[in-house]
Curated annotation (Swiss-Prot):
Pfam families: BTG. Residues 135-165 are annotated as: Disordered. This is Maternal B9.15 protein. One of its GO terms (cellular component) is nucleus. It comes from Xenopus laevis (African clawed frog). PANTHER family: B-CELL TRANSLOCATION GENE, PROTEIN BTG4. Belongs to the BTG family.
Amino acid sequence: MKEEIAATVVFLTMLVKKHKQLSKQKIEKFAAKLTTLLFAKYKTHWYAENPTKGQAFRCIRINECQALDAVLEKACTESNVDFNELGLPKEMTIWVDPFEVCCRYGEKNDPFTIASFKGKDGYNAPKRISNAVEKATSDYHSGTSSDEEPTNKEPKTIPKVSNPNSIYQCADYTQAIPSWSQYPRRKNYQNDGYPHQPMPYYPQQKPYKAFRRSASTFSGPRVDRYHWVNMKR
């Protein structure tokens, strides 16, 4: 555990030195506080026989969308250092596991090894840490963070259609959509907000007139359908 924590602290302090915002004394004080805090945190969550166990607990994560890592925040407070002065990347993840320390810059880059203590690899730890710092710096400038990726990848303009008779022409879509403010607002109505419905209109019809016989009409008995008998004669 001692070697893994030392490699982690050296890696972070080398990144801080590249930022050139803190004095040598402040960097050394921050490194000492960070080492002490990591020892206190990892001593009950270190499993050499199963390195992946407790990996999430030992992970050091920096992300603008999440709260600041508790260990880094406390190390800054106890060393009287502003976290922003460290110059660490906006997104970075460090896995401190038995026999190996890995890092990833951003969310889209591949992880890389900071230091490995498996067999003879431990003898090359200082060189590997230095190479990891250089690789991390290059990945930081070339990688894309999760909050910087464009959310809309659709084309902004509609491509032209070669067929002149096609209804899908670019000119049909260039007119601006009218704003809703150009239309009159809906009137408010009383009585629970519902407007009075007008009564249906039906055209007036002429009243039916019953047929009346005129005075000149014969009132006598009918001989047949074509002849009437006048009884007054």
